[in-house]
Amino acid sequence: MKQIRNTIRRTLLVAGSLALGSALMGLPAVSSARTLDEIVASKKLVIGVNPTLPPLGIFNDKNEIDGFDVDIARKLGELLGVKTEIVQVGSPDRIPFVSSGKIDAVLGAMTITAERQKVIDFTVPLHTEVLGVLTTKAKPYKDWMELNDPAVRLVEVRGATPVKLVQEKLPKAQLLLLDNYPDAVRAIAQGRADAMIDVMDFMTEHTAKHKVDWRIVDAPIEVYFCGIGVQKGNDALREKLSAAVKEMHKSGYVDERWKKWFGGPMLHDPRTAPTYK
């Protein structure tokens, strides 16, 4: 099982590793990031947010960046006693921007990986992402490996990372590929598919549109821990932001904001991470 889990992790993170490698190829010359004292003196914390990862980051009706990450970023500024400036970043920009000192910290589904930890530092985990199985209460599945059956009809989004996992680990299952998540979820709701493997945290907005007794298989395939990225070696800032994240967890602020934006509780507690100290 350990070997399978390691294979899964390599399979799912290969795209991210390649993207990281590409990003690092284009990294600007590293300049010294602002220290915690400099941030406090300037009364401004500059945080990168990716608005193309709803509901972590979105553009609202006023064309302003909004979402879970923005709420967290503003709360971080409040806890540090400074204002927060939001800077738009894309997935390829996140690490280069924080590594070069263009921003003080970065949000945006920053999964804490060994590869990323070579070039930036992370706070304690802010939230998690759970790779799991979406199905209905009418289906008996208790473990994702039960899906490796010719009678099982899986649906996946064309080009999404789990497609390769399904093809390699669940070759006996039927596989329907559709172009987007609304269509994939609709296929299950209409009975054209039995289940889907993906990050479950982002499914609520799609499942809420269908009057179906949805169910997420209890045993997750993998859990990813996401933190806030800062420039390598900026220890005082990292420690201060980690303390702020812990305070937000303790006060219930993270849970409250997550429920607001995701429509339900976080599926896995980030405080269970070995790095949450």
What residue ranges belong to the model's regions?
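Short helix-initiation/N-cap motifs at beta->coil->alpha
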Residues: 85-96, 141-142, 176-186, 190, ...
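Periplasmic-binding protein-like
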Residues: 127-135, 200, 204-246, 264-277
